[in-house]
Each structure stands twice: as C-alpha cells, then as structure tokens.
Amino acid sequence: MVVVDWLGLGLGSVAGALVSEGLKVLISEAKKVLAFKSVSNELASTMESLLPVIKEIESMQDGMELQDLKDTIDKALLLVEKCSHVEKWNIILKSKYTRKVEEINRKMLKFCQVQLQLLLFRNQLKSMPSMEAILNNYFQNINKKLDRLSGSPAPPLVSKRCSVPKLDNMVLVGLDWPLVELKKKLLDNSVVVVSGPPGCGKTTLVTKLCDDPEIEGEFKKIFYSVVSNTPNFRAIVQNLLQDNGCGAITFDDDSQAETGLRDLLEELTKDGRILLVLDDVWQGSEFLLRKFQIDLPDYKILVTSQFDFTSLWPTYHLVPLKYEYARSLLIQWASPPLHTSPDEYEDLLQKILKRCNGFPLVIEVVGISLKGQALYLWKGQVESWSEGETILGNANPTVRQRLQPSFNVLKPHLKECFMDMGSFLQDQKIRASLIIDIWMELYGRGSSSTNKFMLYLNELASQNLLKLVHLGTNKREDGFYNELLVTQHNILRELAIFQSELEPIMQRKKLNLEIREDNFPDECLNQPINARLLSIYTDDLFSSKWLEMDCPNVEALVLNISSLDYALPSFIAEMKKLKVLTIANHGFYPARLSNFSCLSSLPNLKRIRFEKVSVTLLDIPQLQLGSLKKLSFFMCSFGEVFYDTEDIDVSKALSNLQEIDIDYCYDLDELPYWIPEVVSLKTLSITNCNKLSQLPEAIGNLSRLEVLRMCSCMNLSELPEATERLSNLRSLDISHCLGLRKLPQEIGKLQKLENISMRKCSGCELPDSVRYLENLEVKCDEVTGLLWERLMPEMRNLRVHTEETEHNLKLLLTF
C-alpha cells in the first residue's frame, strides 16, 4: 500500500516544505491506475499544475498553512490505492470510484480557487517578478479546468425508487387486502409473481406496494422495469445501471450483462435489501427471469404477468374486484345521469357491472364513456350489450369482450385512428407529432390541419382509449406537439390489433409484421400485401438481410428497429404510393442506417421521421426528394456536419420541403449548409439541441419562413442579424434559450411577426426596433415580462402573457 511518510520526509518539523514531495508521489501513483485512465490523468494534471506554486510557497515559509492540502493528498493516495485493485471489467466499482476520484479533483480545484489565492496574497507572491509567469500560466490552467468541470454534469443523484411509476393521487379501490397478502408473500419468498388477466390492476397493485411505508422501510432500493413482449435483457440491465448512476454502458452480449447485474446487486446489497420489479412479463420469457435470479440473501424479485408461472415461482393471483368495490369504482368514473330514479340507476349499475366483470380497466373505460351522458345513452349502451354474441373472446368472458363495446360506439374515423395505435410497440410513449404525421397523409384531405387530428387524439383520450401526457404545463396551440406524449394501456393496444386482424392477412388495411432474427412470416413472401399502413418490427439480432416483399398499396410505413446497424429494405423503392416513413429505433444507442438510396425513387413520399438513429445530414439533399414536405429528427446523432461536397441545387432537390423539425439531437453544433438553401421552407424547429451556439447568416435566405422555433437551445447566444430578412416570419419561439443575450437589432422590420415566445429569457436584450412591431403577442415568464411591460406605453397593441413552464424530462427515458 502506497502512503506518504510525512515524518520520514521531515514534515514534522517543516510541514510545508515537503507537501510538494507528497504531490510528486501522488502524481506518480495516479498515472499508474490504468482502469481509471481518464479521471486519474485529470487528477494528475491538476496536481502537476499545482506543484510549481506549492514549491514557491515552500521556499518562502514553513508551509503549515498547507495542512488542508496534505490531508487531501492523504485521502487521494488511499483512493488511488483502492483504484489500483479494480479490474477494467468491474463497471460497478469503476463507476463508484470514478465519482470519488472526481470529488477529490473538485476539492483540489476548490483549494486552488480559494485557499491558495489567499496564501499567495498573504505572502505577496503575486508581486514578485519571478512568479508572474508561473502564476499567470497556473491560474489560466485552473480556470480552464473549472470551466470544464462546471460545464460537465454533476454526479447523478441516485433515487431510492428507480423508475417506479406514480399513482397521481388516484383513489384506489379494493386493493387493501390484496396488498396485505402480497406483502406477506413477498417477504417470505425471493421471487413472487402477481398473475391475473389484462386490466385487472396488477401494475396498480405493485405500484401501490412500492409506495407502502413498510416496504420502503424494508428495502434500501427499489428498481422498476417494464419488460413487455419484446424483452431485451441487455437494455433492461443497462437501464438499471443508469438508474443507479453508472452512466451509459454497452454490453456485447447477455453474458456481460449478467456479470454487470451481479456486480451491481452485490455492491448494493452491502447497504441493504434490494427489490427488483419486472412489470408485464409475457409467456416465453422464463429464460429472462432466470437471468435476473441471482442467489443473494438480500435480493427479491416481484413480477407481474397475465400468464401463470405457478409451476416455476410462488404466485399471487389477483382476482377481479368484488361487486361493492367495482360499484364504488364505477360511481367514481360516471355519476348518475340526470332525471334518474334511485332504483333505475341501481338497475343500470348492476347490468353494467355484470358486463364489466370486475375488471378495473373495463370499468374505467365504460365509466368514462358514460360520464355526463343522458339516460337514454346509458340504456342504449346496456341494450347494445344484450344483442347477440361479441366477435371477441371465446366461451369464457375475456377482457377484450368487455372492451369491444367501447370500440363499437366510436365514429368510423376514430375507429381507424384507434386501430392505427397498434402499429407502435407496447409500453411506448409516442410523440403526438408522429401520430399526426401519419394521420395527415392517410386521412387528410387537401387543407386538413394538424388541429383536426389533435382533436381526434383528444376524443380518444376523453373515452380513455389512450392517454395524453404533457411534458410541460403549457399546452401548445401553434400546431407543435413534440411536447405531447401519447400512451396506451397494453390491453387497449391488443384490442386495436385484434380489430385489424379480423380480415385475412393479405386483405388487411393495417398490418403488423414481426421479424425475429431473420425469420420472416411465410404468408408475406408469396403474394402482394394490400395494407395502407404497414408496421415492421425487427429485433436486435436481425442482420438486415431482407427478403423481397411486394407492398404496392402501402402509404404509411413504420419501421420499429432494435439493432445497432440497420439497412433499409430495398423493396421500399417499389412502394410508389408511400407518403410517410417513420424509422424508430428502440435500442439503447443510435442505430446506424444504410441503403438510403431506396428512398430516391418514391414520387409521393412527403414525410420522413428518424428517431434515435445516426445519419449524415449531407445524405438528405442527395436523395432528390422532390415531393418531401416534412423532415423530422428526434434524438438522432449526426456526427460531423460536412459542408457542400457536390454541386447540388438544393432548391430543386428539396423543392417542396416546408418543415424541418430537429429535437433532442445532442451533437448538432451547427446547421448543415443546405438548410438555408431550402427556399420553400415555412417552419424550422430546432429544439433541445444544447451544442448549437449560433445560426448561419444564410438563414436570411429563407424568405418564405413563417415559424422559427429555437426552444431550449441553451448555448444559443444570439440570432443572426440576417433574421431581419425573414419577411414572412409570423412566429418566433426562443423559450429557454438561457444563453441568448440579444435579439437582432433590426427585428422591427419583421412586420408580419405576430408572436414571440421567450420564457426564461430575462437576460435577453430588446433592441429599440421592437417598438415597430405592431399587433405583437408575447408569451413569457414573469421576469422576462418586465422587459416588455416597460414598452407598453409606446406599443399600444402589445399583449404580454406571463406563465411558468415546468418540464418532466424523466418521461423521455424510454426513447
């Protein structure tokens, strides 16, 4: 073990004279720790920059005032000694000690920033000509390190409850006794499965258990993960590690992931008991559960599944609600209709509850559909249930049978939209803008606006067939729905798919294909697919070796991918009716796409959306997509933005492109050359791109631009002066651009500008020319509002709306 022998070095008599020797030992040892190369080298670099100043102080005094630094050196040496015994593959200990090394580095820098400067002034070292060069160089290095340290994210806060969903203060009915029974079974067994039919409240019960004070006291940490019917062991373990503050970690195979999981659990159980909740486990996933079974005394697993695993693990069977609880729940959702006698109301309740069969989800859906409705609609609902057999289920009533009437009462256009929801993977939080893009092309007629299809989403949500989740409290009214998520209960997604599958597979208007490894469905290879909406899922073992498929009528294609490398299928080139293409990656890292050339021959392709993929922006104009109207990127990686390498007339190559949407693309630091050359562009949205610091002056070439949206680009310092040439600009959104210091000097020339949104922009200077903006509406926070209120006497038509915005970014973790 390496320690500094301070007495041996003479520190007992001349304390400060040998602190530099201790620093030399620490620098030498830190450089030897290969498993922590980046952080140990950073620590060594900090100490090397400190060494010459310490030597100068030692030469002028006894150095007793360096005792704090000596103590830090002692701690650092002990930590370096521990790090030297950590193997490269031990990601848990590496993560743990990395944070500790970073903390030591912070202490060193803090000493340099405060205490060292006091010592220098006290000893008047700064006034000595011999020290001027040393100190200038030293403090320049320290300032750079402090800037870099302040710009890097702080060590993550690790919650006791990782990813456990919230119950949103919902009044829960009939779960008290099941909770007591489940707690007892869990405390008596290492693995417990909560089993029951879809929609009976399994997830709600388990979430309530995680909130229980006795359980919170019993377990030091609770992990929660949704498994679903497309389980990915590596992704689940990666998320568990990330929830515990280990950062982004890649596993080459499941064996590495198993080792990482064991290391994590062994480390955490040293501090207390651990509970892992695996929600929505499907039949056939027994192998997955066994990988999570690790023989540790303080580790338990709780599973929810609609399938019965009694033969493998202790199981708690959750039964439907008893009548009194079901009745109470229904009354919560649907109050009595007007002009109803107590007896008549009770009779209706009994008939409805008999149909609902005690399933909480069915009660909720039916209750919502009847809420506020007239008596005759209640009676009509009950009568419709008594007419003939339902097309769902079998001899025994199922949840789908209970949900079918809620689908039957939908208007025709809402039925189509509801069935479209089956094209997305389960347990997904889907951007409303993605769904609206598809509906615009499938059901839009000429001048149809996004508002029409947003209304469709609201109608489905009002009947509890899906849920809308706002990332912020401010609801968009300008057709921008990136901050609106759509979620759907799995059983409702199953209902949507069930409706689509009532026709023979080759005749369906909506078709979902699932390709695991390289196994293609046989029925899709020998005859044409007639679907308008085609969704293809491929797992992370898919090799991109496509077989030919004939899809002449496909207008909307959704590719749900999982592999790190993915080639677009060549048969896309023959989809001459294709209007909208969505490529959504559900893997942990951006997928590398190839074979873009298959898109260049599509005469009707109007919308392309990329999610979590790696693309080269220069590829886009080379495709010559003359019919393209909207191009969207979400959580994409672009790498280096290359400049023009070929002679491409962008105005012709993308002659109809009207909207570009770039959101949460973290490595975008500048716009590609071709965007300002898309003269047809009407809407440019660049949001949550924190590396972007400026826009090019060429942005002024977009003479048709009507909407410029730059929300939450933290490092954007200014808008180019050429912005004044955007003569058709109606709306400007710079909300949460915290680094923005000024608006263009001649912004007042934008006479068509009607709206400016600038929440959290109190440091932004308003030029005098804003006074010339007539009929302007400003949306901002209270502090920013003060900048505008001073102008109200001169701007009689100015309208300032102050509001606060809150964002729940945890909702984005599944993307």
Swiss-Prot record:
ATP binds at G196, P197, P198, G199, C200, G201, K202, T203. Signal peptide: none annotated. Residues 1-150 form the RPW8 domain. GO terms for molecular function: ADP binding; ATP binding. Residues 156-283, 341-440 form the NB-ARC domain. One of its GO terms (biological process) is defense response. One of its GO terms (cellular component) is cytosol. LRR repeats lie at residues 656-678, 680-702, 704-726, 728-750. Keywords: ATP-binding, Leucine-rich repeat, Nucleotide-binding, Plant defense, Repeat. The LRR repeats probably act as specificity determinant of pathogen recognition. Probable disease resistance protein. Belongs to the disease resistance NB-LRR family. This is Probable disease resistance protein At5g66910.
